[in-house]
A protein has these predicted regions:
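Concave beta-strand-loop units of leucine-rich repeat
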Residues: 1-12, 16-56, 62-99, 105-145, ...
Length: 221
């Protein structure tokens, strides 16, 4: 028996709604039990979505924060996600994007979290938001091999890199005078951890070829 779609009409009659957290699929089902039309929810400022059942999310132009997990976009870039001058926080987990193209449409973004995005390979577009970006977290995005764009992110205050990708070096830290915290589990190929010494809080995974241990690094928060 196929259940009728859930009726979201009452939701659209709430013009003062600012926050919406929406999961439309059960673990044992392949299809959502309805579709939310975000073109009819123009005043939202914070949205959290998961999986299928989300229509017209790019119409959300007043968002300050957007979080998505298991979301599948057509373009496989940030063109599939909300953007705008007000957007400051973006968190994407297990999504199908391949690049960050389109991030320049959110020129005031401050905080970007990228987690378990298995198809993401190209983060070079980050230089387009270097002026605004303050915090960047990249975790378990194994296809990213080129982190050279980090040299352009001179206003970062917090940087977290988690995964098995080898960083050639961490010389990019010298270009981040405002950096307060740096944490990584990634192997650093040249083994030189001295750039960490200038950072108030730094954490690395100990490896035999590193010239410093994690315990040698500052832990001031």
């Amino acid at each position: 028996t196929v259940r009728p779609p859930f009726d979201f009409e009452p939701l659209y009659g709430m013009p003062n709604l600012r926050y919406l957290e929406c999961w439309l699929m059960r673990e044992d089902e392949q299809q959502p039990f309805g579709t939310v039309d975000y073109a009819r929810l123009q005043n939202l400022s914070e949205v959290v979505v998961e999986g299928k059942g989300h229509s017209n999310i790019t119409n959300l132009k007043k968002l300050r924060s957007f979080q998505a997990s298991d979301y599948r976009g057509v373009n496989k870039t940030l063109a599939d996600y909300p953007s705008g001058d007000l957007l400051e926080h973006l968190s994407l987990t297990s999504c199908n994007l391949r690049s960050l193209d389109g991030i320049e449409k959110s020129p005031n973004i401050k905080d970007l979290e990228l987690t378990y995005n298995r198809s993401l390979a190209d983060i070079s577009a980050l230089y387009k938001v270097a002026d605004s970006l303050r915090a960047l977290s990249v975790e378990a995005c194994g296809k990213i091999q080129d982190f050279s764009v980090l040299h352009a992110l001179t206003n970062l205050e917090h940087l977290h890199l988690d995964g098995s990708t080898h960083l050639p070096d961490i010389s990019f830290l010298a270009n981040m005078p405002r950096l307060k915290t740096f944490a990584t589990t990634m192997p650093i190929a040249d083994g030189d951890l001295r750039p960490c010494l200038a950072i108030p809080y730094a954490s690395v995974r100990n490896r035999k070829h590193h010239n410093l241990k994690d315990s040698d690094l500052s832990k001031r928060l």
